Regions:
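Aromatic-patch recognition
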Residues: 79-82, 87
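Bacterial N-terminal signal peptides
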Residues: 7-15
Length: 156
């Protein structure tokens, strides 16, 4: 009986742990904040193609993913990734806000039907603090989400 109870408790704990969203990470599709431009481009070339390069150290990449159509990548003056934005496909499976991070810890704003969830993630274990922002017109599904260095201005 003790063995059966232990197995049941282990099963319940594993279900609860797998249902909880993971701690947000400072990356999207393998493109991490502070990554060098060369490393970011190598990863991006493996998952998509460059569509536009801006003089302001910004790039737009079309990616081969069922849920994300494009990645926007911005670099700082040292050509290290300062932000990454993922644009959700309109013709693919939708991404729920809660898949990105725990909604209970987000700051939420709704302005003229536009939903915005913001998480401020503290730095720890050698990782810098960063901000995660998810936006969309639908109250459940996002249109885009971004990770950016905590010291950066708002991403439009």
């Amino acid at each position: 009986m003790k063995k059966l109870t232990s197995l049941f408790l282990l099963l319940v704990i594993s279900i609860l742990v797998s249902a909880a969203p993971a701690r947000p990470r400072p990356e999207i599709m393998g493109i991490s904040l502070e990554m060098s431009r060369d490393d970011a481009r190598a990863r991006l070339k493996s998952i998509g193609s460059l569509e536009k390069e801006d003089r302001k150290r910004q790039e737009v990449w079309a990616v081969k993913d069922s849920r994300i159509s494009h990645l926007l990548v911005g670099y700082d003056a040292e050509y290290r990734v300062r932000y990454v934005t993922a644009i959700a496909r309109t013709d693919g499976p939708k991404i729920r806000y809660q898949e990105i991070a725990d909604l209970k810890s987000a700051r939420r704003a709704v302005v003229q039907g536009n939903h915005k969830f913001t998480w401020e993630i503290e730095g720890r274990r050698g990782h810098e603090a960063f901000i995660l922002i998810a936006r969309g017109h639908d109250p459940q599904y996002l249109d885009s989400y971004s990770v950016k260095k905590a010291d950066q201005e708002e991403i439009d």
